[in-house]
């Protein structure tokens, strides 16, 4: 890394394990400065509950970034709307969560931060606060005015991107259009090159239907839509293999010769990845004008403040963001 960079972290739902995990991140040195967008009392109280040392340093955007030392975090303060009891949701704090996301996103857009790492949010309490919220991915897409974003989850061994994300099954076939596939594959290919440092990405593409349509006998989306798009993109030089049946694609003879898998919908690709690496996975938003990674788990309200939460996914998300920063320099 040419110079020390700043990354911004949002702990997510304040009543969940996000603050616990951020405090745990502070228990080691990092080659980047960790700027946490959060309420100061929330972090110090949670550190006290966990019995872990924590010193909060004020965020100074005009000072050079410094590597984070053990037991410290840099604080970008955002005030809670209501006091927090670990494990108990408070509707007004839905506004607080969105404020942290907005400030962190804006800081990435204006060049303050080299990457954003997000902790788990509780979508229900945000919506209960009368804030329409589908998820981090859609929020950052809208706020950054990105043309299109792609959700990808990754472990050390496997990367799975999604052509569609949070759609009912009955709507997916209609959503898989040539325009969508062109856009999604272009973003996936571009970010594998620029953010992951893969010169010629090799992408496996799932079919939509069982057995990838069985030659048109179990659906024609492969013949009508997916195959023509893949043929066009191969002619442009992309290394694409598919459409392949999703039930046989996830095995070494295919995965050993690929850099990523493109699944057509959420529950086609993610169960395999989460079974293979749950707790070690990272959610990456491709297509944003900045680097964004996230944990692959939820708020685990029942574990908040108990010292039982596994920080592994957050560490993996932060380490991956650091690697991506290096690749883009």
From Swiss-Prot:
Domain of life: Bacteria
Pathway participation: Cofactor biosynthesis; pyridoxine 5'-phosphate biosynthesis; pyridoxine 5'-phosphate from D-erythrose 4-phosphate: step 4/5
Compartmental location: Cytoplasm
Catalysed reaction equations from the record: 4-(phosphooxy)-L-threonine + NAD(+) = 3-amino-2-oxopropyl phosphate + CO2 + NADH
Record key words, sorted: Cobalt, Cytoplasm, Magnesium, Metal-binding, NAD, NADP, Oxidoreductase, Pyridoxine biosynthesis, Zinc
Positions of a divalent metal cation binding: 166, 211, 266
Group of enzyme by EC: oxidoreductase
Biological process (GO), any one: pyridoxal phosphate biosynthetic process
MF annotations from Gene Ontology: 4-hydroxythreonine-4-phosphate dehydrogenase activity; cobalt ion binding; magnesium ion binding; NAD binding; zinc ion binding
Record-stated family: Belongs to the PdxA family.
Protein's job: Catalyzes the NAD(P)-dependent oxidation of 4-(phosphooxy)-L-threonine (HTP) into 2-amino-3-oxo-4-(phosphooxy)butyric acid which spontaneously decarboxylates to form 3-amino-2-oxopropyl phosphate (AHAP).
PANTHER family given in the database record: 4-HYDROXYTHREONINE-4-PHOSPHATE DEHYDROGENASE
Protein name: 4-hydroxythreonine-4-phosphate dehydrogenase
């Amino acid at each position: 890394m040419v110079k020390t960079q700043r990354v911004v972290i949002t702990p997510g739902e304040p009543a969940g394990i996000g603050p616990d995990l951020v405090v745990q991140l502070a228990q080691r040195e990092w080659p980047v400065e960790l700027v946490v967008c959060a309420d100061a009392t929330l972090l110090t109280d949670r550190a006290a509950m966990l019995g872990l040392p924590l010193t909060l340093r004020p965020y100074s955007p005009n000072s050079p970034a410094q590597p984070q030392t053990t037991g410290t975090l840099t604080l970008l303060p955002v005030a809670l709307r209501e006091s927090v009891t670990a494990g108990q949701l408070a509707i007004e704090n839905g506004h607080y969560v969105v404020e942290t996301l907005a400030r962190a996103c804006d800081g990435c857009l204006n060049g303050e931060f080299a990457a954003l790492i997000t902790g788990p949010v509780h979508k229900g309490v945000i919506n209960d606060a009368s804030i329409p919220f589908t998820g981090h991915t859609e929020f950052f897409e809208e706020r950054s005015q990105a043309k299109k974003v792609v959700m990808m989850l990754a472990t050390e061994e496997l990367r799975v991107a999604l052509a569609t994300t949070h759609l009912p099954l009955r709507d997916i076939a209609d959503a898989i259009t040539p325009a969508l596939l062109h856009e999604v594959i272009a973003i996936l290919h571009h970010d594998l090159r620029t953010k992951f440092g893969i010169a010629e990405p090799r992408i496996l593409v799932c079919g939509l239907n069982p057995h990838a349509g069985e030659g048109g006998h179990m659906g024609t989306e492969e013949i009508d839509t997916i195959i023509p798009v893949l043929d066009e993109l191969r002619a442009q030089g992309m290394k694409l293999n598919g459409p392949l049946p999703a039930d046989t694609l996830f095995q070494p003879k295919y995965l050993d010769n690929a850099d990523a898998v493109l699944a057509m919908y959420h529950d086609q690709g993610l169960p395999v990845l989460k079974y293979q690496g749950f707790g070690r996975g990272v959610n990456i938003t491709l297509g944003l004008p900045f680097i964004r990674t996230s944990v692959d788990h939820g708020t685990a309200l029942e574990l908040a403040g108990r010292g039982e939460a596994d920080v592994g996914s957050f560490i993996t998300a932060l380490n991956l963001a650091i690697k991506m920063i290096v690749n883009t320099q």
